[in-house]
C-alpha cells in the first residue's frame, strides 16, 4: 500500500507527457523498487500487464487511483495559515491527485480574511468556527494540521469531534486519537536526522575501508 502512491505519481507524469505503455523494469526503476516487487504489488490489483508490451500507463494509473480511493475528489481542510499552510494551499499538484482544498483555517484574527494560494484559485482564511460546518456538510474528509506543536493536540481533538477520521499532522508533536482515527505524521526534522545517521554510517565505513587499505599497504611494503 505504501508504494502505490509512488507508482501513481510516476504514472500520472508519464500519462501527462503522452506516454502510452511502460515495462515493469522501467516503472520499477523510476520508483526505486525491484521489478519483482513491483509486479507483486500490481498483481494484487489484478494487473499483470501484457508480455512484450508492458502496462498501459493510463489504465494502470486509473486502477491505482481506484485502489487508493482517488476516483472521487477528497476534500481537505487545513488548520494553520502560517508559512507551511500557505505553501500547501499554493501547491498545484493536489487537484491532479484527486484532492481539493476546501478550507484554510486559523485562530488569529489578523490572519482570518487574508487570501493565499494560486492566483487563479486563491483561498480565503476562515476562522476555526468554520471547521465543524465544513466537515458536517461533507466538504472535507481529511484534516491537515499545520500549527505549532503546542496547538496540535487541541486541533486534532476538534477535528475528530467534528467527524474527521483521517488526519495528516505536520506539527512536531505526537497526537493521541481514539480507535478508528488514522493519523499520518510528517516530520521533516526526523527525516533529516535519519539521512544524517545514514550519512554518518557511510562516512565511518569509508574511513574503516581506508584504514584497512593503508594497513594492507604497510604490511606488504
Locations of regions flagged by a protein language model:
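Short secondary-structure boundary segments
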Residues: 147, 170-172
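Short, Lys/Arg-enriched anionic-surface-contact patches
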Residues: 1-6
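Intrinsically disordered or compositionally simple regulatory linkers and C-terminal tails
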Residues: 204-212
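Hydrophobic, well-ordered beta-alpha structural blocks that scaffold small-molecule cofactor pockets
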Residues: 9-19, 23-162, 178-192, 196-203, ...
